[in-house]
Structure formats: structure tokens, C-alpha cells
Amino acid sequence: MDTENKSRADLALPNPQESPSAPDIELLEASPPAKALPEKPASPPPQQTWQSFLKKELEFLGVTQVLVGLICLCFGTVVCSTLQTSDFDDEVLLLYRAGYPFWGAVLFVLSGFLSIMSERKNTLYLVRGSLGANIVSSIAAGLGIAILILNLSNNSAYMNYCKDITEDDGCFVTSFITELVLMLLFLTILAFCSAVLLIIYRIGQEFERSKVPDDRLYEELHVYSPIYSALEDTREASAPVVS
């Protein structure tokens, strides 16, 4: 009986007023989320200007001039070697009497070559040589356009006469020369536009080159003035005090 009472005493019922013991739970303070740094606004893309556009197309414009010059030279050589120019009127072959396919072609090739070289090696003498060559090339192209238009007007009058003639070698040659003049007129206008665009770019480049030294001078003054003042301060601080 004593053992039974002792075991019942050990099995005491829990007191409902006492709170049940629970393991201590450590509460970690949650750190506040880090504030996101404000993102810098993206820099706007650089504005596309005529200068930046032409700078990308310099070599293309130079190659265009070289090709136009070579085509004009080929046409002039083929026509003069296959046709007896003395058998035709001067008005029909005004283009070749003036020698435009030859001197015009040489000027186009020269200006195109200098434009390509000045784009690859941006030296002062090449840039200014390219500018001068393109000015001469644009003048030559303008004269060539005038000669070609005059040649077309003369050929059109001769072609009206050839409408009533079915078989005539002179009319056939005149028709061929007219088509050739039209093709050369298109190529000459293309060379003229290329030369004018290159002149515009080179003149703008010369203006920028003349402005750069003044800007650099002001930048150097702004950059080096605090450096000089800092050096003066350090010299004064490190100077020994003479008693």
C-alpha cells in the first residue's frame, strides 16, 4: 500500500493555473531591408548629326568617286578606240571633243583616293589635300554636267531626224552615244554629290580643328589651377620655421 501511495503522489496532476513550460524561443529582430540605391538615369544616346553620319560614310563616298572615274575612263577609251570620231559631227561627239571622259575621270579617281587615304590616316596634309581635290572635282563635275546636257540636246535634234530613216549607221551610232551620255550624266551627278558631301564634312572638320586649341586651353586652366594651389599649400606647410 505504501508503494502504491508513493507512486500516486509522484503522478501529480498538473495545475491548470500554471502556464505550461515551453522552450525559450529567441526572437531575432528582422533587419529592415536595405534601401535600394537610386539608379542613375541612362545617358541619352548621342544625337545623330550630319558630321557623324558623313564620318561613317567617308570611305564609301571615296570609293564611289573612284568607281565613277574608272567607268568614265573605260567608256571614253572604248568609244575613242572603236569609232572614227572624225566621221561624225562635233555636236554629236561634243563629250569626247571636250575630253571630259579623260580629265574628269582622272580628277574623280584622285579625289576619291585622297578621301579614302585621309579617312584611314587622319593627317593634316591628307585632310587638306582631300578638301582641295574634292573642290576641284566638284567644279569638274559641274562642267561635265553642263557638257553632257548640251551633248544630249544636240543628239536629240539629230535623233528626230533619224526617225524617218530605217537603216543608217550614223543614226545607230548617235543612238548609242546618246545612251552612253545618259549613263555618264547619272554617274557625274553621283560624283558631284559625293564631292559636295565630302567638302561639307571637311570644312566642318576644319572649323572643329580651329576651335579645339581654345577649348583645351580653358580645360587645362581649370584642371591645373587646384593642383597648383594644393602644391603651394604643401610647400608652405612643409617649409621649416626659421627662429
From Swiss-Prot:
GO MF, one annotated term: SH2 domain binding
Superkingdom, taxonomy of origin: Eukaryota
Entry membrane topology: Multi-pass membrane protein
Reported modifications of this chain: Phosphorylated on tyrosine residues by LYN.
Record keywords, A-Z: Disulfide bond, IgE-binding protein, Membrane, Phosphoprotein, Receptor, Transmembrane, Transmembrane helix
Compartments where located: Membrane
Region: Disordered, residue numbers: 1-48
Main location as per UniProt: membrane
Stretches assigned to the Extracellular side: 80-97, 151-179
Cytoplasmic-side positions: 1-59, 118-130, 200-243
One annotated Gene Ontology cellular component of this protein: endosome
Transmembrane segments: 60-79, 98-117, 131-150, 180-199
Modified residues (Phosphoserine): S225
InterPro entries registered for this protein in UniProt: CD20-like (IPR007237), MS4A (IPR030417)
A Pfam entry, by short name: CD20
Keyword Nucleus: no
GO-annotated biological processes: cell surface receptor signaling pathway; immune response; positive regulation of mast cell degranulation; regulation of release of sequestered calcium ion into cytosol; signal transduction
Modified residues (Phosphotyrosine): Y218, Y224, Y228
Function, in words: High affinity receptor that binds to the Fc region of immunoglobulins epsilon. Aggregation of FCER1 by multivalent antigens is required for the full mast cell response, including the release of preformed mediators (such as histamine) by degranulation and de novo production of lipid mediators and cytokines. Also mediates the secretion of important lymphokines. Binding of allergen to receptor-bound IgE leads to cell activation and the release of mediators responsible for the manifestations of allergy.
Membership in a protein family: Belongs to the MS4A family.
Subunit annotation: Tetramer of an alpha chain, a beta chain, and two disulfide linked gamma chains. Binds LILRB1. Interacts with FES/FPS and LYN. Interacts with FGR.
Protein known as: High affinity immunoglobulin epsilon receptor subunit beta
Species this chain originates from: Rattus norvegicus
